[in-house]
């Protein structure tokens, strides 16, 4: 009897151990499946003045480079101001208005179609549609890459007017004779790009993930383009928050990391889309108006001193004017006159007796000094843009000032030209050395101070 009981206990123990082992295996999914990393799509960003840019001129002087940049920033501000107030009235209400041709700051290179055809696009957070020039051309401008021919792509599809992705327009002209969805992009200088809305396969080539395809991306195939750009780029990569934007297609998250824009050999600027976008850092609320990105700027400091500026001058009014836009298409930042007067007065007070004031021929209203930033601004305090949520966007001396000549530099925060301007803009110099990430679904922007090279692995 005792032997039988002992045998029963032994068998029960074996059964328990086998069952426990099976449960442990079942409870550990890592032993039966591989965790899938969130997908991300990465492309290098090429600055207009980079050695990798088709616009690069090794013989250009500092004055040539900065003169273009300042004129471009002024043109871009005019565009943002008009877009922020919805000031454009066009026959085609689907049409966005993109900045004039001089305002190409960053470009991205990826491929369209199957087989893939490389295209170079200007990045723009202030417009929504991704578009490229397409054959056959009624009119096309010069570009560095071959013009995309949709007839040679096995993955190109036009969109019918009834498609949810067809941009809303007036019933009279949203369709062509074949019931395909049309688009029209108008420019500040009166030129335009027009064609069909379609879908196509895009291919990103990344150093860490190889070739990453995106199927059925909505884009504009532009066949009729009147002097839109004076030659190199293929079109525009709109990163605005609309339903047809590539950002929405890839999960409503994207980020860009910008290092030194004045180092022509800096190779680590990059743009990332998708759920695998690096979303880290200090967080501030994001507001969307007229398909521009607005932040809540609460104040400005110079060094440890909070400047006496009324925060109301940075906020958007109930009538839809003013506010603070964050943008990638302007090099400089702009603040309204009352804020600029306080900031420039404080800079002058610190520089008085140390730096020699000079007048810049291109921007006579700018605050400029004789000397070099590295030599003459040793120990000069940086500035901080204080954003809602406790986020401090720090501008060191290379972001607060811009080299404008062989022996001259100017304050890179300026006031808009014209009386009564109430829009503020945070430009790309202020975003140097940050990874700036947008989560459109959560309506948040993340700022992480980082060396962009660290994001490549």
Q: What residue ranges belong to the model's regions?
A:
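Short beta-strand-centered segments at strand-helix junctions
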Residues: 131-133, 235-242, 246, 335, ...
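Solvent-exposed loop/turn segments at secondary-structure junctions
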Residues: 127-130, 137-139, 225-226, 244, ...
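Aspartic protease catalytic domain
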Residues: 2-53, 57-59, 113-115, 123-128, ...
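Intrinsically disordered, low-complexity regions enriched in proline, serine, glycine
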Residues: 132-133, 141-143, 248, 336, ...
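Conserved catalytic motifs of the protein kinase core domain
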Residues: 118, 232, 321
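Eukaryotic endomembrane system proteins
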Residues: 196-207, 211-304, 324
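Extracellular/lumenal carbohydrate-interaction signature centered on repeated Trp-anchored short motifs
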Residues: 193, 247-249, 315-317
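Disordered propeptide/prodomain
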Residues: 2-121, 129-196, 216, 268-270, ...
């Amino acid at each position: 009897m005792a032997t039988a009981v002992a045998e029963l206990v032994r068998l029960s123990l074996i059964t328990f151990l086998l069952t426990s082992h099976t449960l442990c295996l079942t409870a550990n999914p890592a032993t039966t499946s591989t965790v899938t990393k969130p997908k991300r799509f990465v492309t290098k960003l090429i600055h207009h003045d980079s050695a990798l840019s088709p616009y690069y001129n090794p013989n250009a002087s500092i004055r040539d480079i900065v003169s273009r940049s300042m004129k471009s920033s002024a043109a871009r501000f005019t565009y943002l101001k008009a877009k922020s107030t919805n000031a454009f009235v066009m026959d085609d209400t689907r049409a966005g208005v993109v900045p004039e041709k001089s305002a190409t700051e960053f470009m991205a290179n990826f491929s369209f179609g199957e087989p893939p055809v490389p295209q170079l696009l200007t990045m723009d957070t202030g417009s929504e549609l991704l578009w490229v020039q397409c054959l056959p051309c009624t009119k096309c401008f010069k570009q560095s890459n071959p013009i995309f021919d949709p007839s040679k792509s096995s993955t190109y599809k036009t969109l019918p007017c009834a498609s949810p992705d067809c941009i809303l327009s007036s019933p009279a002209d949203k369709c062509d004779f074949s019931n395909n969805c049309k688009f029209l992009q108008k420019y500040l200088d009166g030129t335009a790009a027009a064609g069909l809305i379609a879908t196509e396969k895009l291919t990103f080539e990344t150093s860490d993930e190889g070739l990453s395809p995106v199927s059925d991306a909505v884009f504009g195939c532009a066949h009729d383009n009147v002097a839109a750009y004076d030659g190199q780029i293929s079109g525009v990569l709109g990163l605005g928050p609309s339903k047809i934007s590539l950002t929405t297609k890839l999960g409503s998250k994207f980020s860009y990391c910008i290092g030194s824009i004045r180092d022509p050999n800096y190779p680590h600027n990059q743009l990332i889309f998708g759920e695998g976008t690096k979303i880290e850092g200090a967080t501030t609320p994001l507001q969307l108006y007229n398909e521009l990105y607005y932040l809540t700027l609460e104040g400005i400091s110079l060094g440890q001193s909070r400047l006496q500026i009324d925060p109301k001058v940075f906020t958007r009014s109930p009538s839809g004017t003013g506010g603070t836009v964050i943008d990638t298409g302007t090099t400089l930042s702009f603040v309204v006159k009352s804020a600029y007067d306080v900031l420039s007065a404080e800079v002058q007070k610190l520089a008085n007796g140390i730096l020699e004031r000079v007048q810049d021929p291109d921007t006579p209203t700018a605050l400029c000094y004789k000397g070099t930033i590295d030599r003459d601004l040793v120990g000069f305090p940086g500035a901080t843009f204080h954003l809602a949520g406790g986020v401090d966007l720090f501008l060191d001396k290379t972001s607060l000032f811009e080299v404008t000549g062989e022996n001259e530099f100017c304050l890179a925060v300026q006031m808009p030209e014209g009386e009564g301007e109430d829009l503020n803009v945070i430009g790309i110099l202020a975003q140097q050395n940050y990874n700036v990430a947008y989560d459109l679904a959560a309506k948040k922007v993340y700022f992480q101070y980082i060396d962009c090279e660290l994001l490549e692995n």
